[in-house]
């Protein structure tokens, strides 16, 4: 159906005392992203004209963490209830738009459920998201007459009979802006908590003869809030289980779905295999037939077809062409680039460095600010000395170069095509094409040498 323009209000003023943290509750992360950011993203995906964020505790931290240009910051200086929070945002409501109310500590609400709620909202009435619980203790109960919603009674204000009701309020609702402002102005704090409840607008709407339509989410986890770290950890596992299931159904082989974390977006080809305890962060692309070993962390990187990443390797902001092999225990830092068939072995670190086609750095090596050609062998213990304490400098190594073990290349320096660097050499000047560079101290030998003996 055709929807009205819509703005979203996100309540995020709570302190989160039970988190036992200096960080505002809504900034605690789920799947690598602040809880409230999940809600903001859902609002934006839904096409919100404006997102009003009602904040209180930790406002400076919130503003530092959330840089969404679409946010309108609304201060709730005193936390006097959900109705009071909405009253602070009400001056920003347009009369002819719908207002959707969400919560910064309910991170798994889906766009599909919110669109269903939006579509179900009757003209001039309220769309309400509700669920039925076997044990509704502590939640506001939905009251009905002849099947029609008449109001919401908070648990502390409910009678014994009302407490038997299993349908509860999730707190998520949508109504017209003009109606919302009128109802908010009529709220009182005449209740056990002495607070202004947004839920009281349901009874006000019913008294005006307005229709209230209740819809249910696809999954209960969508409307579960977070008040402590235990609840947050449970929602994290729910989320990760859902992501793992989607990947498995899409053809990705997860060796143990319970030991896989997706903290971003994963784009993948066919026949991808991911072993246990792998973490994917940010935006990651895996080509066809990629294999990732146990304990790896891949962040904001592109991995080409037929690449194999061995266990306990960290890849961040890197690009790998096809058929590269990495690890185990390798680290590719931002700006690392491997061309087709390149190999980076155990205990090799790269940063802002390119390794050419078929080139190899087998072990115990640091390559920083370096451009390395094709078919180059980098021996064990090689270091590009790129930093003088103030500035970074570049090392350039041409095609078909052989770099012996325990070599130091003091940048800026260039090694020409086909050159050979003898083991143990410290390169401080450019090396010509097809030349041999050697800087070792001449070996001496003392015949009949005896090691010192400790005196007894």
From Swiss-Prot:
Region (N-acetyltransferase): 251-456
UniProt: acetyl-CoA binding residues: 380, 386-387, 405, 423, 440
Catalytic activity: alpha-D-glucosamine 1-phosphate + acetyl-CoA = N-acetyl-alpha-D-glucosamine 1-phosphate + CoA + H(+); N-acetyl-alpha-D-glucosamine 1-phosphate + UTP + H(+) = UDP-N-acetyl-alpha-D-glucosamine + diphosphate
EC number, UniProt record: 2.7.7.23, 2.3.1.157
Active site positions: 363
Matching SUPFAM superfamilies: Nucleotide-diphospho-sugar transferases, Trimeric LpxA-like enzymes
Region (Pyrophosphorylase), start-end ranges: 1-229
Cofactor binding annotation: Binds 1 Mg(2+) ion per subunit.
Region (Linker): 230-250
Pfam families per record: Hexapep, NTP_transf_3
Gene Ontology CC terms: cytoplasm; membrane
Alphabetized UniProt keyword annotations: Acyltransferase, Cell shape, Cell wall biogenesis/degradation, Cytoplasm, Magnesium, Metal-binding, Multifunctional enzyme, Nucleotidyltransferase, Peptidoglycan synthesis, Repeat, Transferase
NCBIfam families: glmU, PRK09451.1
Protein family: In the N-terminal section; belongs to the N-acetylglucosamine-1-phosphate uridyltransferase family. In the C-terminal section; belongs to the transferase hexapeptide repeat family.
Stated name of the protein: Bifunctional protein GlmU
Gene from which the chain derives: glmU
């Amino acid at each position: 159906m055709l929807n009205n323009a819509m703005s979203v209000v996100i309540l995020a003023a709570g302190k989160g005392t039970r988190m036992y943290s200096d960080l505002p509750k809504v900034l605690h992360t789920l799947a690598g992203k602040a809880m409230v950011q999940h809600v903001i993203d859902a609002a934006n995906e839904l096409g919100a004209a404006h997102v009003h964020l009602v904040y209180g505790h930790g406002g400076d931290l919130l503003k530092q963490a959330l840089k969404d240009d679409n946010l309108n910051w609304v201060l709730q200086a005193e936390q006097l209830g959900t109705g009071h929070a909405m009253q602070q945002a009400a001056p920003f409501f347009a009369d002819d738009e719908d207002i959707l109310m969400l919560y910064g500590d309910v991170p798994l609400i889906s766009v599909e459920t919110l669109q269903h709620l939006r579509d179900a909202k009757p003209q001039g009435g309220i769309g309400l998201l509700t669920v039925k619980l076997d044990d509704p203790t502590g939640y506001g109960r939905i009251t009905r007459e002849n099947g029609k919603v008449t109001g919401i009674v908070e648990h502390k204000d409910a009678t014994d009979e009302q407490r038997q009701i299993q349908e509860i309020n999730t707190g998520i609702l949508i109504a017209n802006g003009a109606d919302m402002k009128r109802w908010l102005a009529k709220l009182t704090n005449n209740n056990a908590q002495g607070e202004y409840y947004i839920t009281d607008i349901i009874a006000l709407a019913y008294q005006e003869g307005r229709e209230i339509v209740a819809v249910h989410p696809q999954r209960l986890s969508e409307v579960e809030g977070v008040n402590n770290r235990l609840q947050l950890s449970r929602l994290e596992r729910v989320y990760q289980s859902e992501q793992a299931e989607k990947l498995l159904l899409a053809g990705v082989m997860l060796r143990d779905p319970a030991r896989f974390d997706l903290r971003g977006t994963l784009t993948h080809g066919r026949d991808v295999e991911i072993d246990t305890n792998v973490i994917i962060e940010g935006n990651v692309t895996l080509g066809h037939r990629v294999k990732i070993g146990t304990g790896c962390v891949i962040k904001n990187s592109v991995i080409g077809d037929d690449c194999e990443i061995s266990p306990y390797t960290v890849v961040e902001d890197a690009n790998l062409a096809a058929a590269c092999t990495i690890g185990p225990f390798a680290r590719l830092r931002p700006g690392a680039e491997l061309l087709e068939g390149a190999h980076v072995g155990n205990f090799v670190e790269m940063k802002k460095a390119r390794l050419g086609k078929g080139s190899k750095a087998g072990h115990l090596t640091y390559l920083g600010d370096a451009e390395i050609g094709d078919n180059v062998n980098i021996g064990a213990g090689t270091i590009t000395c790129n930093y003088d304490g103030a500035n970074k400098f570049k090392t350039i190594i041409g095609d078909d170069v052989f770099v012996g073990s325990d070599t130091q290349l003091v940048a800026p320096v260039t090694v020409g095509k086909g050159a050979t660097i003898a083991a143990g050499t410290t390169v401080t000047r450019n090396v010509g094409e097809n030349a041999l560079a050697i800087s070792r101290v001449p070996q001496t030998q003392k015949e009949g040498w005896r090691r010192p003996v400790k005196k007894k």
